């Protein structure tokens, strides 16, 4: 799993061109998400929790975005088949599925989120805690739905192009006790303001996007993303591209 963020001690990131497909807004246009696979919770940092995108999102125009870092375009037929299959797998499932009795207790792992846009236009989402660990105790349809979306993610990683966008979500995490020499706060990037507990986040666009990408390039090691604000506060700065409908 990759994220275009600075804390790449947890993940690796990708950057690049090909922004034409990612710049379309999803308000009233064709790019409404119609299927998704993601994760919530688990033992992750506060920054990762805020920046973690869906593992794979399929939009109605066939655009697949994986980890907010790779993209792939499906045909209309592939898009329709994927949505139909996801609807079959998820229809009738409860909003939060529970494993059958006898499942082992698993803690500190993410909850799998699977979703599909139904014929009524509403997004149906099903959450399955610890699906990866106790899949045999869940209805097989949930594993099949995840397998289907995982296949799209694998295709995008192998044959897709880099996903970039004109908007970015940035996160500054307080790092008063961090080791290493901090760099001056990058010019053009908003400094944290107000409450920072333990993070501060902001969605940015325009020149600020170019500034943060220059200051914290995709793939940069965690230890090199330490910055000092004009007031002397230390923060680890991270970011990822926003999805079209975020």
Task: Label each region the model flagged.
Residues 10-13:
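C-terminal motif of bacterial Sec signal peptides marking the signal peptidase cleavage site
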Residues 15-43, 95-246:
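Short, well-ordered, aromatic-rich surface patches in folded extracellular/luminal domains
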Residues 20-78:
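Extracytoplasmic low-complexity, Pro/Thr/Ser/Ala/Gly-rich segments
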Residues 4, 48, 104-106:
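Generic marker of residues within folded, mature protein domains
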Residues 1-7:
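Sec-dependent N-terminal signal peptides
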Residues 63, 87, 119:
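Residue-level marker of positions within ordered structural domains that often coincide
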Residues 78-103:
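Charged, amphipathic alpha-helical segments
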């Amino acid at each position: 799993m990759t994220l275009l963020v600075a804390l790449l001690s947890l993940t690796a990131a990708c950057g690049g061109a090909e922004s034409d497909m990612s710049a379309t807004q999803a308000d009233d246009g064709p790019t409404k998400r119609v299927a998704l696979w993601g994760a919530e919770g688990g033992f992750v940092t506060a920054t990762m929790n805020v920046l973690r995108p869906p593992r794979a999102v399929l939009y109605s125009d066939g655009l697949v975005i994986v980890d907010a870092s790779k993209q792939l375009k499906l045909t209309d037929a592939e898009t329709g088949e994927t949505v139909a299959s996801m609807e079959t797998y998820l229809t009738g499932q409860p909003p939060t599925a529970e494993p059958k009795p006898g499942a082992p207790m698993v803690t500190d792992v993410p909850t799998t989120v699977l979703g599909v846009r139904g014929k009524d236009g509403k997004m149906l989402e099903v959450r399955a805690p610890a699906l990866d660990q106790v899949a045999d105790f869940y209805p097989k349809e949930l594993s099949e739905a995840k397998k289907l979306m995982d296949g799209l993610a694998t295709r995008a990683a192998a044959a897709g192009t880099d996903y970039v966008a004109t908007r970015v979500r940035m996160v500054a995490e307080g790092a008063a006790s961090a080791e290493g020499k901090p760099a001056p706060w990058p010019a053009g990037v908003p400094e944290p303001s107000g409450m920072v507990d333990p993070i501060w986040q902001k969605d940015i666009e325009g020149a600020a996007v170019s500034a943060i990408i220059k200051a914290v390039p995709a793939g940069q090691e965690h230890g090199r993303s330490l910055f000092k604000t004009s007031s002397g506060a230390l923060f680890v700065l991270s970011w990822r591209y926003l999805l079209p409908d975020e």
